């Protein structure tokens, strides 16, 4: 699985793509395969080191995405594999697969594309 990694705070060219192991969800979590990502000002500030909360380095940036459930280890049966969802979370969405707690997941409304 590929992920964008920020090894140090700085301009966008400090970012690089890294091959990583596919994450495994624990109880209460879901494995999501993003299909669309939001890139916003907070992401840029985090990479630059200018946001009020600084993630531990190195980190995978990205706070929001939309994609499909791959595995559901939560107690919510609404998130069956293949379900289209939106996620908002701590940094980490700029990856091919992301593990998130169920509280960070909401279904994509019917009729809305990703």
Residue ranges and their predicted role:
Residues 1-2:
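Extreme N-terminal starter segment of soluble prokaryotic enzymes
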Residues 21-38, 50-92:
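Glycine-rich beta-strand-centered segment in the early N-terminal region that forms part
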Residues 17-22, 66-68, 97-99, 105:
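Conserved hydrophobic/aromatic beta-strand scaffold that supports enzyme active sites
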Residues 45, 84-114:
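NAD(P)H dinucleotide-binding glycine-rich loop of Rossmann-like/cofactor-binding domains
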Residues 14, 79, 98-100:
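Short loop/helix-cap segments at secondary-structure boundaries that form the rim of catalytic
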Residues 42-48:
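Cytochrome P450 core scaffold surrounding the K-helix E-X-X-R motif
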Residues 6, 47, 70-73, 99-101:
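Short beta-strand-to-turn element immediately C-terminal to the catalytic PLP-Schiff-base lysine
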Residues 7-14:
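Extracellular beta-rich ligand/substrate-recognition surface
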